């Protein structure tokens, strides 16, 4: 018998965003962020001792999260943390004739993403609820998810050991945000809403934006959240949400302003903020 369990999540655990920034289907089978998440969450208990040196603790402090390095000043920690990083590029099979070029974000930048979620998750969801047409958008920070288990398989004690992957699957959802809309494009075309639209309209126009990530201008996210003239007038105020988001995306992509990394969930959220403004502008134009 299949049992449906409602698993509660710790909304304050912002580092769980590390577990879902890369989709399992987009990564080699031998790779996951589970180990990074575990080492960071257990750092205080295991590694936070200057006399206790391990390769893992050294790697975390020197490469991944300089905030953990108490041997340098606070100013140096902040400077090291904000340094630019370069994504690791790789390819996966898209279909029988082509490949997808994806980017794996540097661990330090992924942590910066997570901390940005911690500070601005409510602002993100506020700005992704504006469009009436978005197919997939962050609705709120996830606080629970449903897990389906086969009770017959767990009724008796078996020989298999409990793996970290099994434990993580029981504790954490597949996404940091709870999403509205459709999680796969084919579900849109199979939905009742789409069938009803087909009955009402005889023609459908489609615009292919599959390659837009390569050409998104990072400054445009600030223009989408406010407007271009406002941002130019207040360009010195670098602590605004849009400017911080713009800078964070640049630093994680080798300081590039032209294009954003493909494959990261953070990039999808970034692009969604821009497309929400496009949706609103189109709707306003059609209704005027």
Regions found by a protein language model. Name each.
Residues 1-262:
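Conserved two-metal-ion catalytic palm core of "right-hand" nucleic acid polymerases
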Residues 233, 270-288:
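Active-site palm subdomain of RNA-directed nucleic acid polymerases
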């Amino acid at each position: 018998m299949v049992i449906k369990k409602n698993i509660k999540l710790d909304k304050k655990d912002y580092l769980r965003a590390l577990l879902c920034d890369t989709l399992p289907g987009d990564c080699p089978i031998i790779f996951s962020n589970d180990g990074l998440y575990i080492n960071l969450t257990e750092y205080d208990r295991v590694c936070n001792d200057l006399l206790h040196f391990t390769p893992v603790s050294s790697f975390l402090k020197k490469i991944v999260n300089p905030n953990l390095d108490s041997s340098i000043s606070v100013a140096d920690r902040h400077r090291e943390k904000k340094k630019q990083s370069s994504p690791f590029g790789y390819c996966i099979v898209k279909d029988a004739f082509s490949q997808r070029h994806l980017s794996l974000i540097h661990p330090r930048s992924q942590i910066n993403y997570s901390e940005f979620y911690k500070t601005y998750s409510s602002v993100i969801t506020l700005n992704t609820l504006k469009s009436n047409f978005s197919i997939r958008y962050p609705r709120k920070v996830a606080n629970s998810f449903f897990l389906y288990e086969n009770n017959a398989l767990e009724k008796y004690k078996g020989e298999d050991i409990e793996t970290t992957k099994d434990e993580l699957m029981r504790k954490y959802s597949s996404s940091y945000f709870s999403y509205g809309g459709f999680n796969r494009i084919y579900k849109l075309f199979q939905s009742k809403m789409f069938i009803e639209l087909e009955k009402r309209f005889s023609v459908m126009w489609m615009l292919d934006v599959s390659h837009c990530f390569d050409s998104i201008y990072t400054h445009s996210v600030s223009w989408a959240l406010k407007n271009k003239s406002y941002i130019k007038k207040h360009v010195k105020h670098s602590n605004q949400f849009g400017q911080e988001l713009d800078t964070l995306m640049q630093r994680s992509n080798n300081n590039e302003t032209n294009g954003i990394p493909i494959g990261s969930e953070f990039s999808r959220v970034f692009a969604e903020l821009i497309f929400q403004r496009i949706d609103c502008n189109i709707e306003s134009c059609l209704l005027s």
